[in-house]
Amino acid sequence: MSRLQGKRTLITGGTSGIGLETAKQFLAEGARVIVTGVNPDSIAKAQAELGPKVLVLRADSASVAAQKDLAQAVKNHYGQLDVAFLNAGISVWLPIEDWTEEMFDRSFDVNVKGPYFLIQSLLPVFAPSASVVLNTSVSAHVGADRSSVYAATKAAVLNMSKTLSTELLGRGVRINAVSPGPVDTPLYDKLGIPEAYREKLNKDIAATIPLGRFGTPEEVAKAVLYLASDESRWSIGTEIVVDGGRLLNR
């Protein structure tokens, strides 16, 4: 029996990187899948790659109204939802003097407010024993240079996974978190790092990881798959760190 056979699933930020790979693994395990994205090109590519059975929707994680619309679309498509992987996010690393209020608010809107209000909007849609997986980051634990706002958003999401686990347990909703270390994904490419400097930065980052390399979306998706499946039914409010040992070097 496939691990997610017949499960109705939602993956936000599912058109590239960890989200796209998770969608592929969910499909391989028998799930029905909805993914969201914001970039039209990425949406089109994901639709072509995942096939016609997958519903690919545009949804801006920064918009509370969009989260309500997404929850309604999920209800219309499935009736109820068994699994939600809330993966949509942005990663901006800057020194404190370069931050503006607009940039600060955008980071918290996408990374914190969006998933919070999506969970709220999905409450009437969740099936009994639903599983929610939040994508956080080892940045929630590590005081890395220039990561102040990004790390704060991920620490908020990690705490949300614990506090909402307690609050929603009586409703039969399990919430857990996966915290990746440095992973080779398009999100990393969007940091605005000059190409000439990127190779050196990659080597410097890899040197902080005991296993000596970046992780892959496939490796993170396997942890998400476990938390989404009934195999993790006794796991509530927990965090799976997938970081190649990065936290050993705090």
What are these regions (language model features)?
Residues 8, 15-16:
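Conserved glycine-rich cofactor-binding loop
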Residues 95-96, 100-108, 205:
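Substrate-binding pocket helix/loop in short-chain dehydrogenase/reductase
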Residues 97, 142-148, 170, 212, ...:
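Active-site loop immediately N-terminal to the catalytic Tyr-X3-Lys motif
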Residues 119, 153, 161:
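Active-site helix of classical SDR
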Residues 124, 166-170, 233:
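Alpha-helical segment proximal to the catalytic Tyr-Lys
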Residues 137:
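Residue(s) in the substrate-gating loop at a strand-loop-helix junction
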Residues 142, 225, 232, 236-250:
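Short C-terminal tail/terminal secondary-structure segment
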